[in-house]
Every structure is written in structure tokens, then in C-alpha cells.
Amino acid sequence: MTIDQDMSIDDEISEESIYKLKESVDTAPKLELIVKESLFLEENLKIKINALGLEESSKKELNGKTYFGLPSPVDEKINKKIDFPTGNNDIINTNSDIHYGVQFRIKFDINEYCYYIKDCSYGRGYGTFMKVINSMKIRDNMLINIGNNYLVITFGVDDSEPEENNTIDENQKILSIKVFGGDLVNYSYVFNANQVNKILIGKDEKCNVVLIDELLDDVHCMIEFKNNKGWILYDGYENKNSENGTWVSLAEDTQIYDGMLIQSNQNIYLCHLIENQQ
């Protein structure tokens, strides 16, 4: 599927749904994205979104979806899709168009009465991530960013175990970590919860996964296996959060909560939900 095809599918919404969105503007919660760190945007700038989309949008018709991204120097079709420009592509890389286009999308779900966010970069640029606050359950094919490193987490079969022992539950106990970026490229670690149920990741030699990166804490994050819960990702170690955070890709639609931190294209946004008083 091409990027254009996927984006057109994401745009499909019925007239009935748009009518419901319009009716919900005065009662639905509003969302503010507050710029906390940026190379391009004013600090503490508030980007206001309601059930229909970006407030003060230049679009004539809103459909409950707001697209953030970098305008293209050559592709007006992409530019028309972007509701909020997140910077100047010339500043990022004057010799490449890899960063331009839609970076992420926020939509209001009329049935659940809440906002969802999804990365729409499709491998272009830096991607869109949310900061782990305390802990998060790991899912298969999860992408994690810590410092200059990207970790792809997958579940799998342990070839050292007899085939009859590789049940669905047992497969969930096998965790593979593939490292990209930094000093390690395409380097993989495999852990079996029956042997190691706590995995320390950081730059200290005591860690199970050692990454040479000055942006990391000695123990930057931890992955722990818990019975009946599976693998859990924790930011920091021993009740102390990491300095630069542990970030998880928003490759799937994820519900936005008050206080959520989002990182995209070297911008960090704080999400603030405002309940409507009407």
C-alpha cells in the first residue's frame, strides 16, 4: 500500500459522522498540545483542538482529524493535507526531502468521546513517540527509543526448548531485542523469562543490554516479566526515572490522556485535556 492510498483511507468519514462531530463540539472535551521543547516552534505555544479538528484551521471542511507535519517544497497535495506545520524543512535538512510530509494524526472518536493519536511518518523522519510514565505493557513488534538507540521488541520461539514446550504462553516468555542506531547495528538479544525475568538496559556494564550512549543513564530502563501480565517496560530503575526518558512508538492508534508527552520531529508536546463545562 502506498502512502497516498493509506492516507486516503484514513480520510474516509461519513456525512452522518461529521454531523455528529459538529453537534459534539460544545460538549466534547477539548485538547491542547503545549510545545515544551522545539527547534522550530515557540515554547509554550498552545495548539487547540476540538471534536471537529484544529481550531482556527484554514481548511474549509473539518472531519475530526488533525494532521501535523512539515510542508513539502514540491508536493502541494501533501501540503493541503497538513493542518499544523511543525517546522521548516529547510532548517532540518536542505539536501533531503526525507522529513517532509505528515508526521502524526490526532482524531476525535465520537463513540468513545476521546482523542487518539497515531504516527503517520511511514518510516520518514524521526517518527512519533510517547513518553513512558512509570510503566507500560510491551506488545509484539513494539519500537522503543532511548537516547540515540532504537529497540525493536518481538516475541518468539526459543529454539533451545523442546517443540512441545513452545506453547502460545511459552512463546510470550521469549523476548527478542534488536538494536538499531548508536554503536550497535542490527544486534539482537534473546531472553527467556524462565531464565531471566528482569532485563536491565543502559550504559552500565551490569546491564543485560549494554549501550554506549552518553544520553543514557547507567540503568536507563528495565523490562520485567510478570506472570499473568507478560513483559512490562519501566522507565528508569529503583524508583528513579531516567533523565532523557523512555519513548514508545505510536505506530498504532493510542488514546490520549491528560499529561501525556509526545515527541515528533524534534518537538515535544504536553497533552492537556479540558473537560467542556456545558
Identify the residue ranges that each predicted region occupies.
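Internal, hydrophobic cores of structured domains that mediate oligomerization or house catalytic pockets
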Residues: 144-146
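Regulatory inter-domain linker segments that are low-complexity and enriched
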Residues: 1-45, 149-217, 224-229, 265-278
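Forkhead-associated
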Residues: 55-140, 193-265
